[in-house]
A protein has these predicted regions:
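Conserved glycine-rich beta-strand-loop-beta hairpin in the small C-terminal domain of fold type I
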Residues: 316, 335-350, 362-377, 402-405
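N-terminal small-domain helix-loop-helix segment of the aminotransferase-like
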Residues: 3-10, 28-122, 433
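Short, solvent-exposed loop/turn segments at secondary-structure junctions
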Residues: 57-61, 125, 149-150, 199-202, ...
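Short beta-strand
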Residues: 51-53, 88, 267, 363-369, ...
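Conserved core segment of the aminotransferase class I/II
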Residues: 4-18, 102, 256-340
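Short hydrophobic/aromatic beta-strand micro-patches
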Residues: 285, 375-377, 410-412
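PLP-dependent enzyme catalytic core of the Aspartate aminotransferase-like
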Residues: 2-3, 93, 101, 105-112, ...
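Conserved core of the PLP fold type I
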Residues: 79-231, 238-259, 417-419, 424-427
Length: 433
């Protein structure tokens, strides 16, 4: 490891001592990155409460208040000191601790198993990119479902030159566990990266409890066979489940203590979970069997270093606003109201499809039970052509996935009283195409 910064070398030694698998999963960049213990942010933090603080590039008034513009500050209901200065690269500590507590509360199967304290990133996209920086080499393939968020192409393939290998998401209207197992075991034992996104974008599918057990079993068996597994869990739509028998916990709760050869990384955020899309606050959290506080602290430091070298930090104003909001007395009720509204739209889509069997001649819905979206697969016409007809002739916008001949419909963003018309327009457009 000649040429590495001594701080990176020390972090690597700690990681290798506590988890050889985690060390072997790190990319070259992941091994080289470090949190500058004596860098500008660290030195400014050390001087924070001193009488004279001439460290960081932030302007302050003579009385110590941030030197802000009142025309901007007047729009905010929080103190200027909680909005205008820089946040730490790892995120503000009260928010990180709160999110960790929420992960534990929402995923009780974690029990007392030790996990890392989440590191704040600027949205899930940035979180995934940071994970790519730390763990993905240009020789790596990432195993994921054939129905996937198109931004993975930019995040992992364009940025890190990783290959994408797909398993079939569905077989007989259920999760295709056989295809998943085949793809996991296709290559000889070694480093393998798996990316799982539930509720799935674009399909809106979350595995059942039984399917979740089988997915975990496949991964545990692969780890037992000598594979070093990095399992990335994109939990962007976590919590939006609308059916019984469907997993209500993240797979992270099963995988964080699954095997010493499996490092689980949960990437989630307030974007969808907390209805704060433009705040750009997300989290990266680590879990591995027998993970120690020392291991997790080192991974947090490397992650913070990756954030520092990429975006410096996530906005303080967003972190502070959310932290204040989530601690309010009305937060939980407001969140339940929003989920109930999206659930009504979900059930309306189900009713419309059940009431119109004639639609099946032209399109059928992929399995869906959660999230923001559902997809229809066209049977007789081109998705591109139908998309164009809908847009130009029927003032209806959906997302087209031409390579799969799918249309994605965001019921979460569509008024309930417009959903029946949406599918009627789709039916007519398919007949015209």
């Amino acid at each position: 490891m000649a040429g590495l910064n001594p701080q990176a070398e020390e972090l690597n030694r700690i990681i290798e001592r506590h988890s050889k698998t985690t060390y072997e999963l790190l990319s070259k960049k992941g091994k080289a990155i470090y949190w500058p213990a004596k860098g500008i942010l660290a030195q400014s933090a050390a001087a924070k409460n001193k009488n004279i603080n001439a460290t960081i590039g932030t302007a302050y008034e003579d009385d110590g208040r941030p030197m802000i513009l009142p025309s901007i500050a007047g729009l905010l209901k929080i103190d200027a000191k909680d909005a205008f200065p820089y946040a730490p690269s790892e995120g503000i500590k009260p928010l990180r601790d709160k999110w960790k507590a929420l992960i534990k509360a929402k995923n009780p199967s974690l029990g007392n198993h030790e996990i890392s304290t989440p590191v704040v990133t600027s949205g899930v996209t940035n979180g995934l990119s940071i994970v790519g920086y730390m763990f993905v080499e240009d020789t790596d393939d990432i195993i994921l479902a054939d129905a996937y968020w198109e931004n993975y192409d930019l995040v992992f393939t364009n940025a890190y030159n990783a290959g994408l290998r797909f398993f079939n998401l569905f077989k007989n209207q259920a999760f295709d566990i056989d295809s998943f197992k085949t793809e996991i075991n296709r290559a000889p034992a070694g480093k393998k990266i798996v990316l799982l996104n539930f509720p799935n974008n674009p399909s809106g599918y979350t595995p059942t409890f039984e399917e979740g057990e089988k997915i975990t079993g496949v991964l545990k068996e692969a780890a037992n066979s000598g594979n070093k597994l990095l399992v990335i869990l994109d939990d962007s739509y976590f919590g939006l489940v609308f059916e019984d028998r469907v997993m209500t916990e993240s797979l992270f709760s099963r995988l964080a203590d699954c095997h010493e050869n499996l490092l689980a990384i949960k990437v989630d955020g307030i974007t969808k979970e907390e209805y704060a899309w433009g705040f750009r606050v997300a989290f990266v959290t680590y879990g591995i069997k027998n993970g120690t506080p020392e291991l997790y602290k080192t991974l947090e430091d490397k992650t913070a270093g990756s954030v520092r070298g990429n975006i410096s930090s996530s906005p303080l104003v967003s972190q502070s606003l959310f932290l204040n909001g989530i601690n309010s007395e009305t937060h939980d009720k407001e969140k339940q109201r929003n989920k109930a509204e999206i659930g009504k739209r979900y059930r309306k889509v189900k009713k419309v499809l059940e009431a119109h069997p004639e639609y099946r001649e032209y399109f059928e819905a992929l399995p869906f039970n959660s999230g923001y979206f559902m997809c229809v697969k066209l049977k007789k016409s081109s998705a591109d052509k139908v998309w164009e007809i809908l847009l130009n002739n029927y003032s209806t916008g959906v997302i087209c996935f031409s390579e799969k001949n799918l249309l994605r419909i965001a019921f979460a963003s569509t008024a309930e009283d417009k959903l029946e018309k949406l599918f009627a327009n789709l039916y007519v457009a398919c007949k015209e195409a």
